[in-house]
């Protein structure tokens, strides 16, 4: 999922910035070119959003999924709440090419954040230590400790409040 989503985000960002440069230099594209651009951007956007449901499902226990999906819905709409007014205000004040460039920069920021916080190596099971749990805690009984740590599919929950790190 990461490879598809990051690749599509990178392509969409570059395509958007290229489209902005074209519009600043040459103006709005013709109707046929506009439809082709719209279709390409839609395919790239769908390549980012379509795997998101699977990613969210893998990131939470079944009982937490409604909250995770609600949080993703709220966050995506908060981002749109920023992007739509920026597009409208910048587009009316400085032109559509400049608006497209601003949105391309916003997409680039999102891509850089994703690259920084989503590790390229993201194994399903992660070995980790629970210093705060008693040796007879049910979680440690479900996933026995071996070599001073235990492994299982890792999600943020009551027993795992932070993502394990290597240092």
Question: Where are the predicted features?
Answer:
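Intrinsic disorder in cytosolic terminal tails and internal cytosolic loops
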Residues: 117-167
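C-terminal transmembrane bundle of multi-pass solute transporters/carriers
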Residues: 1-121, 125
